[in-house]
Curated annotation (Swiss-Prot):
One of its GO terms (biological process) is tRNA processing. The gene is rph. This is Ribonuclease PH. GO terms for molecular function: 3'-5'-RNA exonuclease activity; tRNA binding; tRNA nucleotidyltransferase activity. Phosphate binds at residues 90, 128-130. NCBIfam families: RNasePH. HAMAP family: RNase_PH. The keyword Cytoplasm does not apply. Pfam families: RNase_PH (PF01138), RNase_PH_C (PF03725). Belongs to the RNase PH family. Keywords: Nucleotidyltransferase, RNA-binding, rRNA processing, Transferase, tRNA processing, tRNA-binding. Its EC number is 2.7.7.56. Homohexameric ring arranged as a trimer of dimers. Phosphorolytic 3'-5' exoribonuclease that plays an important role in tRNA 3'-end maturation. Removes nucleotide residues following the 3'-CCA terminus of tRNAs; can also add nucleotides to the ends of RNA molecules by using nucleoside diphosphates as substrates, but this may not be physiologically important. Probably plays a role in initiation of 16S rRNA degradation (leading to ribosome degradation) during starvation.
Length: 247
């Protein structure tokens, strides 16, 4: 593989994440809400609680978590039409990914017969919307679970581990972390990696665009993703600590 450039078009090093920040509580009625910013990508993540579970889950004493994902009309250079009656395959794939990733770290017995509803609405899309949605939704979910314990709804938080996600890819034969749109749109390989706080993988989504990639290239991309995910989890913890100190 060719040597990585010292800097990318936005000035980042190949192994450098985009700037990460969180705006808390933009919605007054949700159990928790935030806007997560990764570079120019911004996603509104909110959590609501229903005191019931899907019909197939009733009587088991177990909870459930469901996620929805949408691109808002003005989130891209050309307006995105609202998906009303029928969801696109991409939207269905992404919201299932978000739900799977978060359910993996929820103790459904602690939740009881309740459903946590996660909504991820993309305000601005500059690539990495699914990974930003997972990373931001985990933060919103953490805040929601803490609130439910404080309110006496739950005895203890059902959240048992941390989750973050990041993209990696091959662009002009070079491995890059956290691709923006200018990179993602010309990547030969696009990989999304979801990881739990204990370092175990929750999901890997990888696609070759035009030509196959090797096992060694896959390993290089995973090796690039791992420290990036650790940094994102540290940023999640820092964001919550800063939020807690002013509330």
């Amino acid at each position: 593989m060719s040597q990585s450039p010292e800097h990318r078009t936005d000035g980042r090093r190949p192994e450098q994440l985009r700037p990460f920040s969180v705006t808390w509580n933009p919605m007054g009625f949700a159990l928790s809400s935030l806007v997560v910013h990764t570079g120019r990508t911004a996603v509104l993540c909110s959590v609501c609680l229903e005191g019931k579970v899907p019909r197939w889950r009733k009587g088991e004493g177990l909870g459930w978590l469901s996620a929805e994902y949408r691109l808002l009309p003005g989130s891209t250079p050309q307006r995105q039409s609202r998906e009303l009656m029928k969801l696109s395959g991409r939207t269905q794939e992404i919201q299932r990914l978000i739900g799977r990733s978060l359910r993996a770290v929820i103790d459904m017995e602690r939740l009881g017969e309740r459903t946590l509803l996660i909504d991820c609405d993309v305000i601005q899309a500059d690539a990495g919307t699914r990974t930003a949605s997972i990373t931001g939704a985990w933060l919103a979910l953490d805040q929601a679970c803490r609130s439910l314990v404080e309110q006496g709804v739950l005895e203890q938080s059902p959240l048992v581990d941390q989750v973050a996600a990041v993209s990696v890819g091959l662009v002009d034969g070079q491995a890059l972390l956290d691709l923006d749109y200018s990179e993602d749109s010309r990547a030969e390989v696009d990989l999304n990696v979801v990881q739990a706080g204990d370092g175990r993988l929750l999901e890997i989504q990888g696609t070759a665009e035009g030509a196959p990639f090797s096992r060694s290239q896959l390993n290089e991309l995973l090796d690039l993703a791992e420290p990036g995910l650790s940094s994102l989890m540290q940023a999640q913890r820092q964001a919550f600590t800063e939020h807690s100190s002013v509330t």
